[in-house]
């Protein structure tokens, strides 16, 4: 069986739809100086959003202090999923230390603990919210 290409403009409806879908580009948000576009990530509700890493690396502080710091610069601490993407694609933007996520541990036996990401070994775990860890902030933009 030979595979012959169709002449340009002679496509079936499903092929045209597929080509149109491939041509669609996601409009990327404008970045401020020092910001790094991380990518599109979905939240637990399945909504897609852009994630942008903000400039600045905050020294060791408690979880609540880091949450407040991130908010003060117009951001939030990364989620656990966002941390995995940051580890995989932007590890060079982090010290080889542990960084707070924005997620407290929801297990009642671990009240007062929150999730963190290490950028040395790459593991995730929980630490007491009174512990002092580093932080980076992200901003999220919902994709309409």
Tell me the role of every PLM-derived stretch:
Residues 2-75, 116, 120-121, 129, ...:
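Extracellular adhesion/carbohydrate-recognition regions
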Residues 80-144:
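C-terminal, surface-exposed recognition/capping segments
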């Amino acid at each position: 069986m030979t595979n012959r290409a169709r002449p340009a403009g002679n496509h079936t409806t499903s092929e045209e739809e597929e080509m149109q879908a491939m041509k669609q580009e996601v409009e990327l948000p404008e970045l401020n100086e020092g910001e790094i576009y991380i990518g599109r990530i979905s939240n637990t509700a399945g909504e897609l959003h852009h994630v942008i890493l903000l400039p600045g690396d905050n020294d060791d502080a408690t979880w609540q202090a880091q949450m407040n710091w991130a908010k003060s610069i117009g951001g939030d601490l990364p989620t656990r999923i966002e941390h995995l993407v940051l580890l995989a694609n932007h590890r060079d933007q982090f010290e080889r230390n542990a960084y707070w996520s924005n997620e407290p541990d929801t297990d009642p036996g671990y009240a007062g603990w929150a999730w963190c990401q290490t950028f040395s070994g790459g593991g995730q775990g929980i630490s007491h919210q009174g512990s002092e860890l580093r932080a980076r902030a992200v901003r999220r933009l919902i994709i309409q």
